[in-house]
């Protein structure tokens, strides 16, 4: 059983929003996951498509005879990254803090187990 992994670090999207998209494709095979992400109208979907393609490319690099259609999304998880703090000027000389959240997304693909009969 072969696994390949791709990690996106410091991606400019909040982990809460990215988890909504990641939960949609967990467990699906590669082609079906790409189709789901293509028709998902969220900013995180394009980031996850890039990571999924990278994980498949990593798997093919490890085993060149591997068929990409025999892979599925074994694990996908989103962790909180650092928070960029910015300030917005407000009335009467005050300022409000703006927290721009970053996230780390990890995608693990694995081969679909073939049943021996």
Curated annotation (Swiss-Prot):
Stored InterPro entries: Ribosomal_uL22, Ribosomal_uL22_bac/chlpt-type, Ribosomal_uL22_bac/org-type, Ribosomal_uL22_CS, Ribosomal_uL22_sf
Q: What Pfam families would the database entry show?
A: Ribosomal_L22
Does the record bear Ribosomal protein in its keywords?
A: yes
Q: What PROSITE patterns has UniProt attached to this entry?
A: RIBOSOMAL_L22 (PS00464)
Cellular component (GO) terms are: cytosolic large ribosomal subunit
> Where on the tree of life does the source sit, at the highest rank?
Bacteria
Q: What PANTHER family does the entry give? A: CHLOROPLAST 50S RIBOSOMAL PROTEIN L22-RELATED, LARGE RIBOSOMAL SUBUNIT PROTEIN UL22M
Identify its protein family.
Belongs to the universal ribosomal protein uL22 family.
Briefly state the protein's biological role.
This protein binds specifically to 23S rRNA; its binding is stimulated by other ribosomal proteins, e.g. L4, L17, and L20. It is important during the early stages of 50S assembly. It makes multiple contacts with different domains of the 23S rRNA in the assembled 50S subunit and ribosome. The globular domain of the protein is located near the polypeptide exit tunnel on the outside of the subunit, while an extended beta-hairpin is found that lines the wall of the exit tunnel in the center of the 70S ribosome.
This chain's protein is named Large ribosomal subunit protein uL22
The gene it comes from is rplV
């Amino acid at each position: 059983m072969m696994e390949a992994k791709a990690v996106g670090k410091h991606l400019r999207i909040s982990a809460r929003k990215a988890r909504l998209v990641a939960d949609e494709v967990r467990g699906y095979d590669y082609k079906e996951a790409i189709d789901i992400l293509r028709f998902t109208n969220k900013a995180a979907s394009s980031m996850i498509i890039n990571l999924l393609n990278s994980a498949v490319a990593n798997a093919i690099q490890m085993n060149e005879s591997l068929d990409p259609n025999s892979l599925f999304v074994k694990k996908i998880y989103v962790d909180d990254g650092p928070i960029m703090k910015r300030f917005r000027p407000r009335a009467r000389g005050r300022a409000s803090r703006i927290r721009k959240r970053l996230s780390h997304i990890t995608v693990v693909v694995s081969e679909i187990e073939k049943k021996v009969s």
